[in-house]
Amino acid sequence: MASTSNVFASVQKMGKALMLPVAVLPVAGLLLGIGAANFSWLPESVSLLMRQSGDVIFGNMALLFAIAVALGFTNNDGVSAVAATVSYVVLLGTMGVMAKVFGVVPVTVMGIPSMQTGVFGGILAGGVAAVMFNRFYKITLPTWLGFFAGKRFVPIITALAAIALGLVLSVIWPPVQGAINSFSHWAAVSDPRLAATLYGFVERLLVPFGLHHIWNAPFFYEVGTFTDATGKVV
């Protein structure tokens, strides 16, 4: 029972952590929508500024999720946010190299050729950063390495862990992405009514436990594509 309670508490904590980047979306949506509307009373430069500001938030949601997950599991310690950023960019770089090895066409994410893992990659990178922080933030090293002891060691070990994660994801992710694409096609084209019913039923079941944010994440940020206000397919 204790292990079940721990798992339940961890999943709840994950759900709460995901709400931090989600809270930014309304502002990002307003900026993007108003900027793309090209109102006659709004100078073109201001519209462009608002549109780009909103678009850059949506374009970097995975990084925001990585930071939020790391903070959520480390009592909001800022070092974990740095570690999460390191974890995510190293993950992208590793998967970019492996994409060439496996013959996968890379996409550019934050200027880095990589595989497109979306917010899942960010969540995993943040989770790795949180685990490394909680494991090593009190580590002691020999005197001549004392500068790197304690919390300063966390981003270093996180980078190494992110390389390992990237190697594993490079093998696992392509078939997973294929399954997600197949599911999104089924949900949007083959039987959207059944898909909506299934989603709503499970989501309502999880609300009393505070776990619905976990269920929502793949539907909100991974499944399917859409065209935003600027005409960009996401």
Predicted regions and their residues:
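Early transmembrane hairpin of solute transport permeases
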Residues: 7-149
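Residue-level signature of transmembrane alpha-helical entry/exit and packing/kink sites
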Residues: 59, 118, 122, 154-155, ...
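Juxtamembrane membrane-interface segments at transmembrane alpha-helix termini
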Residues: 92-102, 156-157, 190-198
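Small-residue-rich segments of transmembrane alpha-helices in multi-pass membrane proteins
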Residues: 151-161
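Transmembrane alpha-helical segments of polytopic membrane transport and secretion proteins
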Residues: 1-5
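Juxtamembrane interface elements at the cytosolic ends of transmembrane helices
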Residues: 128-144, 160, 168-181, 213-217
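Hydrophobic alpha-helical segments and their helix-loop junctions in multi-pass secondary transporters
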Residues: 91-99, 161-174
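Aromatic-rich transmembrane-lumenal/periplasmic boundary elements in polytopic membrane proteins
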Residues: 173-233
